[in-house]
Amino acid sequence: MNPEYDYLFKLLLIGDSGVGKSCLLLRFADDSYLDSYISTIGVDFKIRTVEQDGKTIKLQIWDTAGQERFRTITSSYYRGAHGIIVTYDVTDLESFNNVKQWLNEIDRYASENVNKLLVGNKNDLTSQKVVSTETAKAFADELGIPFLETSAKNATNVEEAFMAMTAAIKTRMASQPAGGAKPPTVQIRGQPVNQQSGCCSS
């Protein structure tokens, strides 16, 4: 056991490009916000250590690029993830409709019992909101996953989202048998992931 922390959890932020994943990560990890944020190329991650129920938990949070062309890169990052935050933009109906597609990605690549959280970001833009809280909540309830609306800009529910996810993972880990520290997460269907992708040579 590492003396610096009791748990190390790997979290993923996924969702369409432009929904504010990087802004959520910046707000939670650094408590900062940038109005103009460069689109994430590939994958970026930040670390924040939190205290919960007397335990020190190190969170390694990966910000995956939302663009279709990066799918092959990010698929390998699903494996080993303890929790996945699926993000959409409350002012962009298409990003909400694409949540189903992202959940399919999770089913395909992530471990079976991974924790999920649906997050509707940019909730500060009330006049531009097109995805109602009721619609999103009903959708999340149907799937049996927790749901929160956030604003990275004014920090609404950002801390709550990450801490709720952390608590859910910790509860799940505690309920696993002692020998279950390495659950059978690597069920690779399809080709091996170590193919060289020429993402930088285009």
From Swiss-Prot:
This protein's UniProt keywords: ER-Golgi transport, Golgi apparatus, GTP-binding, Lipoprotein, Membrane, Nucleotide-binding, Prenylation, Protein transport, Transport
GO CC annotation: Golgi apparatus; Golgi membrane; plasma membrane; plastid
Pfam families: Ras
SUPFAM superfamilies per record: P-loop containing nucleoside triphosphate hydrolases
Polar residues bias locations: 192-202
Region: Disordered, residue numbers: 174-202
Position of sequence motif Effector region: 37-45
Binding site for GTP: 15-23, 33-40, 63-67, 121-124, 151-153
Cystines in this chain: none
One of the protein's GO biological processes: protein transport
GO MF annotation terms: GTP binding; GTPase activity
Lipid attachment residues per UniProt (S-geranylgeranyl cysteine): 199-200
Membrane topology: Lipid-anchor
Cellular location(s): Golgi apparatus, trans-Golgi network membrane; Golgi apparatus membrane
Function: Protein transport. Regulator of membrane traffic from the Golgi apparatus towards the endoplasmic reticulum (ER).
Family membership: Belongs to the small GTPase superfamily. Rab family.
Identification of the protein by name: Ras-related protein RABD2b
